[in-house]
């Protein structure tokens, strides 16, 4: 019976030092010459705080859109000149109207009385227009006043000012049927003792949460329409005109949702504030953060160039909607999460989301 072949002896483990030619030359140079003196490097060193470190906080939204705020109204020489020439033009129109009516009376009395009747109708229409525009401007100012009073009431120890702010907020949103449940909940807590921060948080959740959901739907729908029109339109000027149309429509819908209901002048002021905020923050242009968001979701390799432009224009429309939401919302975001630009990418490109392991 033959013996099984024995295993060959195994080599014992050993350690080897690997040095390349550059390391050998550097070591030989140091051995032959003087060694470098130890030094400390304390200049041009930037220490990143832990809360701002993206590697320690990967869930932090680094591309958050800045909060929009109304512009401060300042008196300028242009406004003074416009007011002076406006008064002069009004006087000229008044003198021309007076001369016209006098000439009509000299020709026939009934022509003069007809001109007076037409003038009275025109004056009444102008007064109604002025009242409507003034009311719209006052509603916009009321929203900003409630927001400022809410910030001040948060610092109080007694809930008196907070109750007053909640009452004004309830009156502002009383015409909206979606706030009926929230108004009933707040009315049931009138006899309870609640500190101001918790009371303002309760008012925000009960009154503004359903409106925020509707506002998000408005932004998503407007962004989708802009994305589709940009993808199929033959000219760039069509894209620009449609983006402006959707932006104005979205801002007006956002103002009406939160109880502002601005007139024509109020709409121009609100549109100017939104565009000024976007111009200052650089959000109206396709910046590095927007490109990073698009590329980070893998759209560059999955979309055509034209469809990619549509997605970018849709994200720009979403930023306009977020800025309008900040301006029209009567309370700042505290108890509820403020929407970010990344919240709308999945809605604009639902087919780009991962589907798991299914083939």
UniProtKB/Swiss-Prot annotation:
Membrane topology summary: Multi-pass membrane protein
Biased composition (Basic and acidic residues): 23-42
Pfam family, one: DUF697
UniProt keyword list: Cell inner membrane, Cell membrane, Membrane, Transmembrane, Transmembrane helix
Keyword Cell division: no
InterPro entries: DUF697 (IPR021147), UPF0283 (IPR006507)
Transmembrane segments: 77-97, 111-131
Primary location: membrane
Name used for this protein in its record: UPF0283 membrane protein RL2646
Organism in which the protein naturally occurs: Rhizobium johnstonii (strain DSM 114642 / LMG 32736 / 3841) (Rhizobium leguminosarum bv. viciae)
């Amino acid at each position: 019976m033959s013996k099984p072949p024995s295993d060959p002896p195994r080599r014992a483990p050993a350690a080897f030092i690997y040095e390349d030619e550059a390391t050998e030359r550097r070591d030989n140079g140091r051995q032959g010459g003087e060694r470098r003196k130890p030094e400390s490097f304390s200049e041009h060193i930037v220490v990143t705080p832990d809360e701002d470190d993206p590697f320690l906080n990967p869930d932090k939204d680094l591309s958050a859109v800045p909060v929009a705020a109304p512009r401060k109204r300042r008196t300028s020489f242009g406004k003074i000149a416009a007011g002076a020439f406006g008064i002069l033009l009004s006087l000229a129109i008044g003198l021309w109207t007076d001369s016209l009516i006098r000439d009509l009376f000299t020709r026939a009395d009934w022509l003069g009385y007809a001109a007076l009747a037409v003038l009275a109708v025109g004056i009444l229409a102008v007064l109604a227009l002025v009242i409507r525009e003034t009311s719209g401007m006052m509603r916009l100012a009321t929203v900003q006043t409630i927001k400022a009073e809410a910030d001040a009431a948060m610092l109080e120890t007694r809930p008196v000012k907070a109750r007053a702010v909640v009452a004004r907020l309830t009156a502002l949103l009383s015409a909206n049927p979606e706030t009926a449940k929230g108004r009933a909940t707040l009315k049931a807590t009138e006899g309870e003792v609640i500190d101001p921060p918790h009371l303002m948080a309760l008012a925000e959740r009960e009154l503004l949460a359903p409106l925020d959901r509707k506002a998000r739907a408005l932004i998503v729908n407007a962004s989708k329409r802009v994305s589709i029109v940009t993808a199929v339109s033959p000219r760039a000027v069509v894209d620009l005109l449609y983006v402006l149309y959707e932006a104005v429509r979205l801002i007006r819908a956002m103002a009406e949702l939160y109880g502002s209901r601005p007139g024509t002048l109020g709409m121009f002021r609100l549109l100017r504030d939104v565009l000024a905020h976007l111009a200052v923050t650089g959000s109206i242009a396709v910046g590095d953060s927007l490109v990073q968001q698009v590329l980070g979701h893998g759209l560059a390799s999955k979309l055509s160039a034209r469809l990619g432009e549509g997605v970018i224009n849709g994200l720009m429309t979403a930023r306009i909607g977020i800025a309008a939401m900040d301006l029209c919302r009567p309370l700042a975001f505290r108890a509820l999460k403020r929407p970010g630009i990344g919240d709308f990418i999945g809605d604009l490109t639902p087919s780009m989301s991962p589907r798991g392991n299914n083939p």
